[in-house]
Every structure is written in C-alpha cells, then in structure tokens.
C-alpha cells in the first residue's frame, strides 16, 4: 500500500510542533502573538481584479521535486517578489521535506509590506499561535488533513487572531467542507497531497461550485504564463506559485505572469 504522504507530513509537523512546545510553552507563544502588529488585510490584497493576482512562495524543496533552490536569504527573495508585483507571499515552514522554518517566516515578515502566509501542515492550535507570533497574516488549512470539527475550530481561531485562513481542497466534497467553515479564501490544489499526483484541470471542474463571495485560488501546476492563462480562463482570481519562481528570475517571471 502506498504511503499517504499528507498523513505522513501532518504527523511529522505535529511532532515538530510538540518538540517546539516543550521548549516554548503555549503561554509564551500567545504573549508574543498578542504583542505583534495587527495582521494585514489579506482579503483586500487578494480581492478579484482585472488580472490574476499572484501569491509568490518561498520554497526550497518538496517531496515531489526534491531540492529546488538553496534560498540562503528568504527576506531578499521576498523583496524581489514584492518588486515583481506579487500580492502576497507564502512561506513554507515545514522542516522535514520542504526545508522551511518559522525563522524564514519571521525574516520575510520583517522585509516586506505584503501579507504573508504560513504554509504548513496545521493540525493543532499551537501552530496557529506560532504563525501569529511569527507575524503571519494568513494560515493554510488543508481540508484533507483535518476532521471537520478540527477544521472549523482552527479556522475560527485564525479569524479570532485577526488572520485570514486559506482553506485548501482537492475534491468537490472537500470544497464543500471548506465553504462550510465560512472561509472567504479557498484554494483548489491540482496536486493530490496524498499521492502528489497532478491534475491540471481539476480547478476548472470545481470552480463553478464557488459562492460568489469567495476568492478562488488555484494552486500547483503553474510553470508558465500559459498555465496562468489556463487558470484565469477557468475562473481563478489568484494563483499560488512556488517552483516556477525559485528556479527562475523571479521579477521577470512575475512580470510575465501578471501580464496575463
């Protein structure tokens, strides 16, 4: 039987969070979170416009592609993303397979004026408080990794802390579960996180299910301006892009993508 990569990644993220919690209890993280400047209004930054908006990702590696880029200075890359016209920045904080960290998020937050997303396998409230303490404005929630009650609890906690949940789905059922939380920023990931297989046309099949007041985000399989155009034609308001940016001149690539 193949390994369920999403379950494996989520379990690992929880183990790592428990280790951090042993060194830094929740009360300490809550205190730092409370002292942060208010989160930036991500829904405004990502609101539908004449052209597709881009969430640009700081991404060193992935289970499907292995190492992508060293990125010794995430803040410098984030500044290039901002220069290139990104509307928000995603920072991988998963340590084991994506080679990210909360320190990456903190450095990016200090470097740019754009909303910043914590891209992580979130399954515990401690991780949400960590995100706010590190300066995150958005937090990813993956429907497939969470029971509905926990998904709703985490969604509500993110909102309570002033941040914006990006709720990610991969099937019609998961999309319905995302909408049931009240999320206003919902993504369809072309990559099945259990197998890491891609279905580039998935977003187009699911886009018509979105309520009119929910921002539509297309995730994965964006390698070229043609891919951005494909998602735009299917109804995407926002695309999330990682590999294509970290393996190219990010300013030039963003300019090309934003011209679609």
From Swiss-Prot:
In the record, biological process GO terms are: L-tryptophan biosynthetic process
Enzyme's top EC category: lyase
Q: Where are the transmembrane segments?
A: none
Q: What are the entry keywords?
A: Amino-acid biosynthesis, Aromatic amino acid biosynthesis, Decarboxylase, Lyase, Tryptophan biosynthesis
Protein's UniProt keywords contain Zinc: no
Task: Cite a single GO MF annotation.
Answer: phosphoribosylanthranilate isomerase activity
Q: What is its EC number?
A: 4.1.1.48
Q: Which reaction does it catalyse?
A: 1-(2-carboxyphenylamino)-1-deoxy-D-ribulose 5-phosphate + H(+) = (1S,2R)-1-C-(indol-3-yl)glycerol 3-phosphate + CO2 + H2O
Q: By its UniProt entry, which SUPFAM superfamilies does this protein fall under?
A: Ribulose-phoshate binding barrel (SSF51366)
Q: Part of which pathway?
A: Amino-acid biosynthesis; L-tryptophan biosynthesis; L-tryptophan from chorismate: step 4/5
Among HAMAP family, the record links this protein to: IGPS_B
Identify this protein by name: Indole-3-glycerol phosphate synthase
Source organism:
Leifsonia xyli subsp. xyli (strain CTCB07)
Organism lineage: Bacteria, Bacillati, Actinomycetota, Actinomycetes, Micrococcales
